[in-house]
């Protein structure tokens, strides 16, 4: 009898231990179950997305709200593409996240290489691109590419050798203003940064960010050129010639570059992006593992460029600019984020401990005003419903570049 009781006690202890271990590891397998609030709280978000679908802005999408501990709310809406018979959007639908590539792949890669002292944020670009030598751009720094203050502008690439065309075209073009004096959002800045990662490491950007970020974070559905084995989960996009694209990057320059580019090309899910956002709100740590240094996170999210308060940029991240619609009216001055042309956006507020992810199957690319309003309204609602902090705070401390 005593032996049986000891065995039962031991078994019970083992079960309790396993349950505790499972509870701590739950986010490793997937974010914790979202707190699906009843009544008016979620009804407001449902109504907002329902209106966007009824007005033809989007076919459907996924909304996810979280904090540094995990997911607070997640919900899928509508269809996964414009096709009338398209499958419904699911929480794990995989979206082309377009320019979010800049902040979840390219900029973190540059900061990680800087903290490893493999490059410096104040390196002249010519150090890594000898093609720029003698072209009047000796003062152009890596920092200028990250903040879109290089003076470079976008241009079409030759189809025969698009990467060579991109680098040579950037090196030879006349700058739009003095270096560092003007904010001009241009994809070419991040195309160069993506190629810089390859030249510094000897690895493709896709390989480097998978090894450094996506795999350690457990972002299993995040990649450039996602595998066809996940084709049934893709949200389709529409190319400029009205072709439906499934698992192929929508951005034409990224397609020319083989689907791997510093400005666009990553595909992801809302839950994978939640992992990345949690890491950033925890100053570079995720589930006890260091992904980026706290200093690198603070550097990326500090204000590096300001034009009379009208444009404030971090390193890759947007803080306050004409592109800041996802900031809404409830996020603080230290919040930051980015948008993607395909209908994606993320916005994070460390002072209020909240982030918002919006991934959509966008239909109307011309109605930018209403789409910006959708992003803004979602963040305003999310802050109102889920954030315990409402007061605004001062701009973050600028740690300065790694040298």
Where are the language model's segments positioned?
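Bacterial N-terminal signal peptides that target proteins for export
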Residues: 3-15
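Bacterial N-terminal signal peptides
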Residues: 13-25
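Boundary at the C-terminal end of the N-terminal hydrophobic targeting segment
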Residues: 26-30
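Short, conserved catalytic-motif segment at the N-terminal edge
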Residues: 36-95, 118-120, 164-169, 251, ...
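Short active-site loop at a secondary-structure junction
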Residues: 51-64, 84-144, 177-189, 261-264
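Short, surface-exposed loop or secondary-structure junction motifs
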Residues: 77, 81, 135-335
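Short, surface-exposed beta-strand/loop micro-motifs that present aromatic residues
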Residues: 265, 335, 342-355
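Short, gly/Ser/Thr-rich active-site loops of penicillin-recognizing serine hydrolases
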Residues: 282, 296, 301, 309, ...
């Amino acid at each position: 009898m005593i032996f049986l009781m000891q065995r039962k006690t031991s078994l019970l202890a083992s079960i309790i231990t396993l349950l505790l271990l499972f509870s701590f590891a739950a986010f490793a397998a997937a974010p914790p179950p979202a707190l699906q609030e009843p009544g008016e709280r979620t009804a407001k978000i449902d109504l907002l997305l329902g209106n966007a679908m009824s007005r033809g802005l989007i076919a459907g999408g996924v909304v996810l709200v979280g904090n540094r501990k995990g997911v607070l709310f997640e919900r899928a809406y509508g269809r996964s593409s414009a096709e009338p018979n398209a499958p419904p959007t699911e929480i794990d639908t995989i979206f082309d996240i377009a320019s979010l590539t800049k902040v979840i792949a390219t900029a973190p890669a540059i900061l990680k290489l800087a903290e490893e002292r493999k490059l410096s944020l104040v390196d002249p670009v010519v150090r890594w691109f000898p093609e720029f030598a003698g072209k009047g751009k000796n003062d152009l720094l890596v920092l200028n590419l990250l903040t879109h203050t290089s003076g470079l502008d976008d241009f079409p690439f030759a189809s025969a050798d698009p990467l060579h065309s991109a680098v040579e075209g950037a090196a030879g073009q006349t700058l739009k203003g003095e270096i560092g004096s003007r904010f001009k959002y241009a994809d070419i800045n991040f195309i160069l940064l993506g190629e810089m990662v390859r030249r510094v490491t000897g690895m493709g950007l896709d390989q480097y960010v998978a090894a450094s970020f996506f795999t350690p974070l457990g972002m299993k559905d995040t990649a450039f050129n996602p595998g066809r084995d996940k084709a049934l989960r893709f949200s389709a996009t529409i190319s400029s010639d009205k072709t439906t694209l499934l698992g192929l990057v929508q951005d034409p320059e990224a397609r020319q570059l083989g689907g791997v580019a510093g400005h666009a090309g990553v595909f992801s899910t809302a839950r994978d992006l939640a992992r990345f956002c949690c890491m950033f709100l925890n100053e570079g740590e995720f589930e006890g593992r260091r992904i980026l240094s706290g200093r690198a996170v603070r550097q990326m999210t500090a204000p590096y460029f300001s034009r009379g308060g009208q444009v404030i940029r971090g390193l890759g991240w947007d803080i306050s600019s004409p592109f800041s619609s996802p900031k809404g009216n409830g996020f603080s001055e230290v919040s930051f984020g980015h948008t993607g042309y395909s209908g994606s956006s993320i916005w994070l507020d460390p002072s209020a401990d909240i982030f918002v992810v919006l991934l959509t199957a966008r239909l109307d690319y011309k109605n930018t005003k209403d789409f910006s309003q959708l992003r803004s309204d979602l963040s305003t609602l999310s802050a109102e419903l889920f954030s315990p902090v409402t007061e605004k705070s001062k701009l973050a401390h600028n740690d300065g570049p790694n040298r």
